[in-house]
Amino acid sequence: MGKYFGTDGFRGEAGITLTADHAYKVGRFLGWYYNALRERNGDNNPARIVIGKDTRRSSYMFEYSLVAGMTASGADAYLLHVTTTPSVAYIARVDDFDCGIMISASHNPYYDNGIKLIDCYGEKMPEETLLLVEDYIDGKLHVFDQDWPELPFARREHIGCTVDYVAGRNRYMGYLISLGIYSFKGVKVGLDCANGSSWNIAKSVFDALGADTYVINNQPNGLNINLNAGSTHIEGLQKFVVEKGLDIGFAYDGDADRCLCVDEKGNVVTGDHILYIYGCYMKERGKLLTNTVVTTVMSNFGLYKAFDEKDIGYAKTAVGDKYVYEYMAKNGCRIGGEQSGHIIFSKYASTGDGILTSLKMMEVMLAKKKPMSELAAPLKIYPQVLENVRVTDKKAAQNDEAVQAAVKNVAEALGDTGRILVRESGTEPVVRVMVEAPDHDTCQKYVSEVVDVIRDRGYSL
Protein backbone atom coordinates (compact mmCIF):
# COMPACT_ATOMS: atom_id res chain seq x y z
CA MET A 1 0.00 0.00 0.00
CA GLY A 2 1.12 3.53 -0.74
CA LYS A 3 0.92 6.77 1.15
CA TYR A 4 -2.64 7.61 0.09
CA PHE A 5 -4.07 4.59 -1.72
CA GLY A 6 -4.79 1.49 0.34
CA THR A 7 -6.54 -1.72 -0.66
CA ASP A 8 -9.82 0.21 -1.03
CA GLY A 9 -8.51 3.37 -2.62
CA PHE A 10 -7.78 6.82 -1.17
CA ARG A 11 -10.11 7.04 1.81
CA GLY A 12 -10.58 9.47 4.69
CA GLU A 13 -12.77 12.12 6.24
CA ALA A 14 -14.01 14.50 3.55
CA GLY A 15 -12.42 17.92 3.82
CA ILE A 16 -9.69 16.74 6.20
CA THR A 17 -7.85 13.59 5.12
CA LEU A 18 -9.34 13.63 1.63
CA THR A 19 -9.92 17.08 0.14
CA ALA A 20 -11.24 18.59 -3.07
CA ASP A 21 -7.65 19.54 -3.88
CA HIS A 22 -6.62 15.88 -3.68
CA ALA A 23 -9.43 14.96 -6.06
CA TYR A 24 -8.49 17.72 -8.50
CA LYS A 25 -4.90 16.48 -8.58
CA VAL A 26 -6.01 12.88 -9.13
CA GLY A 27 -8.14 14.00 -12.08
CA ARG A 28 -5.41 16.30 -13.38
CA PHE A 29 -2.80 13.56 -13.41
CA LEU A 30 -4.98 10.78 -14.81
CA GLY A 31 -6.31 13.02 -17.58
CA TRP A 32 -2.79 13.93 -18.65
CA TYR A 33 -1.33 10.45 -18.16
CA TYR A 34 -3.87 8.61 -20.30
CA ASN A 35 -3.72 11.27 -23.00
CA ALA A 36 0.06 10.86 -23.02
CA LEU A 37 -0.26 7.08 -23.32
CA ARG A 38 -2.62 7.50 -26.27
CA GLU A 39 -0.25 9.93 -28.00
CA ARG A 40 2.64 7.52 -27.57
CA ASN A 41 0.53 4.90 -29.35
CA GLY A 42 -0.29 7.27 -32.21
CA ASP A 43 -3.84 7.98 -31.03
CA ASN A 44 -4.76 11.67 -30.93
CA ASN A 45 -8.26 11.15 -29.56
CA PRO A 46 -8.79 12.39 -25.99
CA ALA A 47 -8.65 9.95 -23.10
CA ARG A 48 -12.04 8.80 -21.80
CA ILE A 49 -12.60 8.34 -18.07
CA VAL A 50 -15.86 7.12 -16.53
CA ILE A 51 -16.91 8.31 -13.07
CA GLY A 52 -19.50 7.03 -10.63
CA LYS A 53 -20.39 8.15 -7.12
CA ASP A 54 -22.40 7.12 -4.09
CA THR A 55 -24.98 9.23 -2.26
CA ARG A 56 -22.75 11.10 0.23
CA ARG A 57 -23.07 14.86 0.20
CA SER A 58 -19.33 15.19 -0.42
CA SER A 59 -19.45 12.87 -3.44
CA TYR A 60 -20.71 15.73 -5.60
CA MET A 61 -17.82 17.94 -4.47
CA PHE A 62 -15.28 15.27 -5.34
CA GLU A 63 -16.96 14.54 -8.67
CA TYR A 64 -16.73 18.20 -9.70
CA SER A 65 -13.09 18.36 -8.58
CA LEU A 66 -12.11 15.24 -10.50
CA VAL A 67 -13.88 16.49 -13.63
CA ALA A 68 -12.17 19.88 -13.37
CA GLY A 69 -8.78 18.20 -13.15
CA MET A 70 -9.19 15.74 -15.98
CA THR A 71 -10.85 18.14 -18.42
CA ALA A 72 -8.12 20.70 -17.67
CA SER A 73 -5.69 18.02 -18.84
CA GLY A 74 -7.69 17.36 -21.99
CA ALA A 75 -9.51 14.15 -21.06
CA ASP A 76 -13.24 13.58 -21.48
CA ALA A 77 -15.24 12.78 -18.33
CA TYR A 78 -18.25 10.45 -18.58
CA LEU A 79 -20.61 10.70 -15.61
CA LEU A 80 -22.64 7.70 -14.48
CA HIS A 81 -23.89 9.79 -11.53
CA VAL A 82 -25.09 7.80 -8.49
CA THR A 83 -24.21 4.19 -9.19
CA THR A 84 -22.42 1.18 -7.73
CA THR A 85 -18.71 0.37 -7.71
CA PRO A 86 -19.18 -2.82 -9.77
CA SER A 87 -21.10 -0.85 -12.40
CA VAL A 88 -18.09 1.44 -12.90
CA ALA A 89 -15.81 -1.60 -13.24
CA TYR A 90 -18.18 -3.19 -15.75
CA ILE A 91 -18.60 -0.08 -17.89
CA ALA A 92 -14.87 0.74 -17.83
CA ARG A 93 -14.25 -2.70 -19.32
CA VAL A 94 -17.06 -3.15 -21.85
CA ASP A 95 -17.13 0.43 -23.15
CA ASP A 96 -13.35 0.68 -23.64
CA PHE A 97 -12.61 3.50 -21.21
CA ASP A 98 -9.03 4.32 -20.32
CA CYS A 99 -9.94 4.00 -16.65
CA GLY A 100 -12.79 4.35 -14.18
CA ILE A 101 -13.20 6.22 -10.91
CA MET A 102 -15.65 5.47 -8.12
CA ILE A 103 -16.27 8.05 -5.40
CA SER A 104 -17.25 6.17 -2.26
CA ALA A 105 -16.13 5.14 1.20
CA SER A 106 -18.14 1.92 1.00
CA HIS A 107 -19.59 1.02 4.42
CA ASN A 108 -18.09 4.03 6.25
CA PRO A 109 -20.26 6.84 7.68
CA TYR A 110 -21.34 9.78 5.50
CA TYR A 111 -18.56 12.12 6.59
CA ASP A 112 -15.91 9.83 5.12
CA ASN A 113 -15.35 9.41 1.41
CA GLY A 114 -12.94 7.77 -0.96
CA ILE A 115 -11.60 7.58 -4.50
CA LYS A 116 -11.28 4.12 -6.04
CA LEU A 117 -9.32 3.86 -9.29
CA ILE A 118 -10.16 1.14 -11.80
CA ASP A 119 -8.19 0.22 -14.91
CA CYS A 120 -9.48 -0.44 -18.42
CA TYR A 121 -10.01 -4.11 -17.60
CA GLY A 122 -12.42 -3.31 -14.77
CA GLU A 123 -9.83 -4.29 -12.18
CA LYS A 124 -8.19 -2.26 -9.44
CA MET A 125 -5.55 0.03 -10.88
CA PRO A 126 -1.97 -1.33 -10.85
CA GLU A 127 0.25 -0.32 -7.97
CA GLU A 128 2.78 1.36 -10.24
CA THR A 129 0.13 3.74 -11.62
CA LEU A 130 -1.16 4.54 -8.13
CA LEU A 131 2.37 5.44 -7.05
CA LEU A 132 2.63 7.91 -9.95
CA VAL A 133 -0.65 9.51 -8.82
CA GLU A 134 0.66 9.76 -5.26
CA ASP A 135 3.89 11.34 -6.43
CA TYR A 136 1.95 14.00 -8.33
CA ILE A 137 -0.18 14.76 -5.27
CA ASP A 138 3.07 15.33 -3.36
CA GLY A 139 4.51 17.61 -6.04
CA LYS A 140 6.75 15.10 -7.80
CA LEU A 141 6.38 14.19 -11.45
CA HIS A 142 8.69 11.55 -12.88
CA VAL A 143 6.92 9.70 -15.68
CA PHE A 144 8.13 7.95 -18.84
CA ASP A 145 11.70 8.03 -17.48
CA GLN A 146 11.88 11.79 -17.24
CA ASP A 147 11.10 14.62 -14.83
CA TRP A 148 8.34 17.05 -15.74
CA PRO A 149 8.29 20.60 -14.33
CA GLU A 150 4.48 20.74 -14.45
CA LEU A 151 1.57 19.29 -16.33
CA PRO A 152 0.48 21.35 -19.34
CA PHE A 153 -3.08 22.67 -19.44
CA ALA A 154 -5.26 21.79 -22.40
CA ARG A 155 -6.29 24.78 -24.53
CA ARG A 156 -9.10 25.72 -26.89
CA GLU A 157 -10.73 22.72 -28.54
CA HIS A 158 -8.42 20.36 -26.62
CA ILE A 159 -10.08 21.08 -23.26
CA GLY A 160 -11.95 17.94 -22.24
CA CYS A 161 -15.70 17.43 -22.52
CA THR A 162 -18.11 16.33 -19.80
CA VAL A 163 -20.65 13.72 -20.91
CA ASP A 164 -23.84 12.71 -19.10
CA TYR A 165 -23.57 8.92 -19.31
CA VAL A 166 -26.64 7.54 -17.56
CA ALA A 167 -26.87 5.17 -20.54
CA GLY A 168 -23.85 3.36 -19.12
CA ARG A 169 -25.59 2.75 -15.81
CA ASN A 170 -28.65 1.49 -17.68
CA ARG A 171 -26.46 -0.86 -19.69
CA TYR A 172 -25.10 -2.33 -16.47
CA MET A 173 -28.63 -2.85 -15.15
CA GLY A 174 -29.54 -4.61 -18.38
CA TYR A 175 -26.53 -6.87 -17.97
CA LEU A 176 -27.61 -7.88 -14.47
CA ILE A 177 -31.15 -8.58 -15.65
CA SER A 178 -29.76 -10.78 -18.43
CA LEU A 179 -28.08 -12.97 -15.80
CA GLY A 180 -31.38 -13.88 -14.15
CA ILE A 181 -31.98 -17.32 -15.67
CA TYR A 182 -35.13 -17.96 -13.61
CA SER A 183 -38.25 -15.86 -13.18
CA PHE A 184 -38.56 -14.42 -9.68
CA LYS A 185 -42.34 -14.27 -9.97
CA GLY A 186 -44.03 -15.02 -6.65
CA VAL A 187 -40.84 -14.68 -4.58
CA LYS A 188 -41.07 -12.04 -1.85
CA VAL A 189 -37.69 -10.30 -1.63
CA GLY A 190 -36.56 -7.68 0.87
CA LEU A 191 -33.78 -5.24 -0.03
CA ASP A 192 -31.83 -2.97 2.33
CA CYS A 193 -30.06 -0.43 0.13
CA ALA A 194 -28.22 1.36 2.98
CA ASN A 195 -29.41 4.70 1.54
CA GLY A 196 -26.51 4.24 -0.84
CA SER A 197 -25.60 3.49 -4.43
CA SER A 198 -28.06 0.64 -4.92
CA TRP A 199 -31.09 2.64 -3.79
CA ASN A 200 -32.70 2.64 -7.25
CA ILE A 201 -30.72 0.04 -9.19
CA ALA A 202 -31.42 -3.03 -7.03
CA LYS A 203 -35.19 -2.65 -6.98
CA SER A 204 -35.29 -2.02 -10.72
CA VAL A 205 -33.39 -5.26 -11.38
CA PHE A 206 -35.54 -7.38 -9.07
CA ASP A 207 -38.76 -5.85 -10.39
CA ALA A 208 -37.68 -6.59 -13.96
CA LEU A 209 -37.16 -10.25 -13.02
CA GLY A 210 -40.65 -10.47 -11.56
CA ALA A 211 -40.01 -10.46 -7.81
CA ASP A 212 -42.39 -9.02 -5.25
CA THR A 213 -39.87 -6.48 -4.01
CA TYR A 214 -39.95 -4.74 -0.63
CA VAL A 215 -37.31 -2.11 0.07
CA ILE A 216 -35.99 -0.30 3.13
CA ASN A 217 -33.35 2.42 3.42
CA ASN A 218 -33.74 3.67 -0.14
CA GLN A 219 -34.25 7.38 0.56
CA PRO A 220 -30.74 8.87 0.55
CA ASN A 221 -30.31 12.47 1.70
CA GLY A 222 -26.53 12.74 1.61
CA LEU A 223 -26.15 12.21 5.34
CA ASN A 224 -27.87 8.88 6.02
CA ILE A 225 -25.76 6.46 3.96
CA ASN A 226 -25.05 3.35 6.10
CA LEU A 227 -26.79 5.00 9.07
CA ASN A 228 -28.21 2.05 11.02
CA ALA A 229 -28.72 0.48 7.62
CA GLY A 230 -27.24 -1.93 5.14
CA SER A 231 -24.90 -4.89 5.52
CA THR A 232 -23.13 -3.47 8.58
CA HIS A 233 -26.45 -2.98 10.44
CA ILE A 234 -28.34 -5.99 9.21
CA GLU A 235 -30.64 -6.22 12.23
CA GLY A 236 -33.08 -3.87 10.52
CA LEU A 237 -33.45 -6.21 7.55
CA GLN A 238 -33.79 -9.22 9.87
CA LYS A 239 -36.78 -7.61 11.56
CA PHE A 240 -38.25 -6.48 8.22
CA VAL A 241 -38.07 -9.96 6.66
CA VAL A 242 -39.81 -11.59 9.62
CA GLU A 243 -42.50 -8.92 10.00
CA LYS A 244 -43.35 -8.94 6.29
CA GLY A 245 -43.13 -12.72 5.93
CA LEU A 246 -40.58 -12.46 3.12
CA ASP A 247 -38.81 -15.39 1.46
CA ILE A 248 -35.35 -13.79 1.47
CA GLY A 249 -33.62 -10.50 2.19
CA PHE A 250 -30.45 -8.90 0.83
CA ALA A 251 -28.46 -6.09 2.46
CA TYR A 252 -25.89 -3.99 0.60
CA ASP A 253 -23.30 -1.49 1.75
CA GLY A 254 -22.85 2.10 0.59
CA ASP A 255 -21.42 1.31 -2.84
CA ALA A 256 -23.09 -2.11 -3.23
CA ASP A 257 -19.93 -4.12 -3.77
CA ARG A 258 -20.90 -6.41 -0.90
CA CYS A 259 -24.02 -8.31 0.11
CA LEU A 260 -25.24 -10.25 3.11
CA CYS A 261 -28.47 -12.25 3.18
CA VAL A 262 -31.25 -12.84 5.67
CA ASP A 263 -33.14 -16.12 5.38
CA GLU A 264 -36.91 -16.48 5.70
CA LYS A 265 -36.54 -17.07 9.46
CA GLY A 266 -34.58 -13.87 10.01
CA ASN A 267 -31.15 -15.48 10.35
CA VAL A 268 -28.07 -13.78 8.89
CA VAL A 269 -26.38 -15.52 5.96
CA THR A 270 -22.77 -14.28 5.88
CA GLY A 271 -20.24 -14.15 3.09
CA ASP A 272 -18.89 -17.50 4.28
CA HIS A 273 -22.36 -19.03 3.90
CA ILE A 274 -22.61 -17.58 0.40
CA LEU A 275 -19.25 -19.08 -0.57
CA TYR A 276 -20.35 -22.44 0.81
CA ILE A 277 -23.78 -22.41 -0.86
CA TYR A 278 -22.53 -21.37 -4.28
CA GLY A 279 -19.38 -23.49 -4.07
CA CYS A 280 -21.50 -26.60 -3.43
CA TYR A 281 -23.92 -25.60 -6.20
CA MET A 282 -21.10 -25.31 -8.74
CA LYS A 283 -19.46 -28.53 -7.52
CA GLU A 284 -22.72 -30.46 -7.98
CA ARG A 285 -22.95 -29.20 -11.56
CA GLY A 286 -19.33 -29.90 -12.44
CA LYS A 287 -18.61 -26.19 -12.90
CA LEU A 288 -16.29 -25.49 -9.97
CA LEU A 289 -13.14 -24.96 -12.02
CA THR A 290 -9.95 -26.07 -10.23
CA ASN A 291 -12.27 -27.40 -7.47
CA THR A 292 -11.27 -24.34 -5.44
CA VAL A 293 -13.14 -21.62 -3.57
CA VAL A 294 -10.97 -18.61 -2.71
CA THR A 295 -11.32 -17.18 0.80
CA THR A 296 -9.35 -14.83 3.04
CA VAL A 297 -7.65 -15.60 6.33
CA MET A 298 -10.70 -14.14 8.11
CA SER A 299 -13.14 -16.78 6.86
CA ASN A 300 -14.59 -18.94 9.61
CA PHE A 301 -12.90 -22.19 10.64
CA GLY A 302 -16.24 -23.93 10.14
CA LEU A 303 -16.20 -23.07 6.43
CA TYR A 304 -13.06 -25.12 5.88
CA LYS A 305 -14.48 -28.03 7.86
CA ALA A 306 -17.59 -27.94 5.65
CA PHE A 307 -15.53 -27.77 2.45
CA ASP A 308 -13.47 -30.76 3.59
CA GLU A 309 -16.68 -32.76 4.05
CA LYS A 310 -17.77 -31.86 0.50
CA ASP A 311 -14.31 -32.53 -0.99
CA ILE A 312 -14.06 -28.90 -2.09
CA GLY A 313 -10.62 -27.31 -2.11
CA TYR A 314 -9.93 -23.80 -0.89
CA ALA A 315 -7.28 -21.12 -0.91
CA LYS A 316 -6.66 -18.39 1.68
CA THR A 317 -5.46 -14.90 0.75
CA ALA A 318 -4.76 -11.73 2.68
CA VAL A 319 -7.80 -9.68 3.67
CA GLY A 320 -9.16 -7.60 0.78
CA ASP A 321 -11.15 -8.44 -2.34
CA LYS A 322 -8.16 -7.18 -4.33
CA TYR A 323 -6.11 -10.16 -3.16
CA VAL A 324 -8.99 -12.57 -3.66
CA TYR A 325 -9.42 -11.47 -7.28
CA GLU A 326 -5.68 -11.57 -7.98
CA TYR A 327 -5.55 -15.19 -6.85
CA MET A 328 -8.66 -16.08 -8.83
CA ALA A 329 -7.35 -14.48 -12.01
CA LYS A 330 -3.95 -16.14 -11.68
CA ASN A 331 -5.31 -19.61 -10.92
CA GLY A 332 -8.51 -19.73 -12.97
CA CYS A 333 -10.92 -19.88 -10.02
CA ARG A 334 -14.60 -19.04 -10.48
CA ILE A 335 -15.74 -17.97 -7.01
CA GLY A 336 -14.10 -16.26 -4.07
CA GLY A 337 -14.78 -13.68 -1.44
CA GLU A 338 -14.83 -12.48 2.12
CA GLN A 339 -16.88 -13.13 5.22
CA SER A 340 -18.04 -9.50 5.04
CA GLY A 341 -19.93 -10.17 1.81
CA HIS A 342 -17.49 -9.17 -0.93
CA ILE A 343 -18.16 -12.06 -3.31
CA ILE A 344 -16.55 -12.31 -6.74
CA PHE A 345 -18.00 -14.42 -9.55
CA SER A 346 -15.14 -14.16 -12.02
CA LYS A 347 -17.16 -15.43 -14.99
CA TYR A 348 -19.43 -12.41 -14.67
CA ALA A 349 -17.50 -9.64 -12.91
CA SER A 350 -14.01 -8.44 -12.00
CA THR A 351 -14.95 -7.15 -8.57
CA GLY A 352 -17.33 -7.87 -5.72
CA ASP A 353 -20.91 -7.09 -6.75
CA GLY A 354 -23.67 -7.10 -4.15
CA ILE A 355 -26.60 -7.16 -6.57
CA LEU A 356 -25.00 -9.91 -8.66
CA THR A 357 -24.46 -11.90 -5.47
CA SER A 358 -28.18 -11.54 -4.71
CA LEU A 359 -29.08 -12.85 -8.15
CA LYS A 360 -26.80 -15.85 -7.74
CA MET A 361 -28.34 -16.73 -4.37
CA MET A 362 -31.79 -16.47 -5.95
CA GLU A 363 -30.60 -18.79 -8.71
CA VAL A 364 -29.53 -21.46 -6.22
CA MET A 365 -32.79 -21.20 -4.27
CA LEU A 366 -34.91 -21.53 -7.39
CA ALA A 367 -32.78 -24.25 -9.00
CA LYS A 368 -32.78 -26.43 -5.87
CA LYS A 369 -36.29 -25.45 -4.78
CA LYS A 370 -35.08 -24.94 -1.22
CA PRO A 371 -35.37 -21.99 1.18
CA MET A 372 -32.21 -20.14 2.14
CA SER A 373 -32.32 -21.50 5.70
CA GLU A 374 -32.02 -25.05 4.37
CA LEU A 375 -29.21 -24.18 1.96
CA ALA A 376 -27.19 -22.51 4.72
CA ALA A 377 -27.88 -25.06 7.48
CA PRO A 378 -25.01 -27.52 6.79
CA LEU A 379 -22.39 -24.84 7.48
CA LYS A 380 -21.70 -24.72 11.22
CA ILE A 381 -20.10 -21.39 12.08
CA TYR A 382 -17.60 -21.60 14.93
CA PRO A 383 -17.87 -18.98 17.68
CA GLN A 384 -15.41 -16.17 17.09
CA VAL A 385 -13.99 -13.45 19.32
CA LEU A 386 -12.07 -10.57 17.75
CA GLU A 387 -10.36 -7.83 19.74
CA ASN A 388 -8.72 -4.78 18.19
CA VAL A 389 -5.76 -3.53 20.20
CA ARG A 390 -4.60 0.01 19.49
CA VAL A 391 -0.80 -0.01 19.53
CA THR A 392 2.16 2.31 19.12
CA ASP A 393 3.86 0.08 16.52
CA LYS A 394 1.87 -2.57 14.64
CA LYS A 395 4.80 -4.49 13.21
CA ALA A 396 6.83 -4.46 16.42
CA ALA A 397 3.86 -5.68 18.44
CA GLN A 398 3.04 -8.49 16.02
CA ASN A 399 6.67 -9.62 15.71
CA ASP A 400 7.52 -9.40 19.41
CA GLU A 401 8.97 -12.72 20.64
CA ALA A 402 6.75 -12.86 23.71
CA VAL A 403 3.65 -12.15 21.63
CA GLN A 404 4.59 -14.80 19.08
CA ALA A 405 5.22 -17.30 21.88
CA ALA A 406 1.76 -16.60 23.30
CA VAL A 407 0.20 -17.10 19.87
CA LYS A 408 2.06 -20.37 19.41
CA ASN A 409 0.87 -21.64 22.80
CA VAL A 410 -2.75 -20.88 21.91
CA ALA A 411 -2.43 -22.55 18.50
CA GLU A 412 -1.02 -25.68 20.11
CA ALA A 413 -3.76 -25.73 22.75
CA LEU A 414 -6.49 -25.42 20.11
CA GLY A 415 -5.02 -28.04 17.80
CA ASP A 416 -7.54 -28.95 15.11
CA THR A 417 -10.51 -27.70 17.15
CA GLY A 418 -10.03 -24.04 16.26
CA ARG A 419 -7.50 -21.41 15.27
CA ILE A 420 -5.89 -18.11 16.24
CA LEU A 421 -5.09 -15.27 13.87
CA VAL A 422 -3.11 -12.15 14.76
CA ARG A 423 -2.70 -9.51 12.07
CA GLU A 424 -2.15 -5.79 11.74
CA SER A 425 -4.79 -3.47 10.32
CA GLY A 426 -4.03 -1.99 6.93
CA THR A 427 -5.57 1.38 7.76
CA GLU A 428 -5.39 1.90 11.55
CA PRO A 429 -2.78 1.66 14.36
CA VAL A 430 -4.37 -1.61 15.40
CA VAL A 431 -3.40 -5.25 15.87
CA ARG A 432 -6.35 -7.63 15.53
CA VAL A 433 -6.43 -10.77 17.68
CA MET A 434 -9.01 -13.34 16.61
CA VAL A 435 -9.76 -16.81 17.98
CA GLU A 436 -12.28 -19.37 16.73
CA ALA A 437 -13.12 -22.34 18.92
CA PRO A 438 -16.03 -24.68 19.75
CA ASP A 439 -17.42 -22.29 22.39
CA HIS A 440 -17.36 -18.57 23.16
CA ASP A 441 -15.65 -18.88 26.56
CA THR A 442 -12.68 -20.67 25.02
CA CYS A 443 -12.40 -17.97 22.36
CA GLN A 444 -12.45 -15.19 24.95
CA LYS A 445 -9.92 -16.96 27.19
CA TYR A 446 -7.31 -17.30 24.46
CA VAL A 447 -7.88 -13.83 22.99
CA SER A 448 -7.37 -12.32 26.44
CA GLU A 449 -4.14 -14.26 26.93
CA VAL A 450 -2.58 -12.79 23.79
CA VAL A 451 -3.98 -9.28 24.29
CA ASP A 452 -2.62 -9.22 27.84
CA VAL A 453 0.87 -10.01 26.53
CA ILE A 454 0.67 -7.20 23.95
CA ARG A 455 -0.30 -4.77 26.69
CA ASP A 456 2.25 -6.09 29.19
CA ARG A 457 4.97 -5.55 26.59
CA GLY A 458 4.06 -1.85 26.47
CA TYR A 459 2.67 -1.62 22.94
CA SER A 460 -0.92 -0.59 23.67
CA LEU A 461 -2.04 3.01 23.33
List each model region and its residues.
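An N-terminal, well-structured beta->alpha segment
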Residues: 1-68, 72-73, 162-186, 395-396
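General beta-strand structural signal in soluble alpha/beta enzymes
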Residues: 5-6, 51, 77-82, 102-103, ...
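Gly/Ser/Thr-enriched, mixed-charge loops and adjacent short helices
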Residues: 13, 113-242
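N-terminal small/polar loop signature for handling phosphorylated ligands or for N-terminal nucleophile
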Residues: 36, 40, 48-112, 204-262
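Short glycine-rich phosphate-binding loop at a beta-alpha junction
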Residues: 43-54, 188-190, 291-297, 432-434
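Proline/glycine-rich low-complexity loops and linkers
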Residues: 80, 131-173, 178, 264-337, ...
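Phosphate-binding and adjacent anionic-ligand microenvironments
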Residues: 248, 285-461
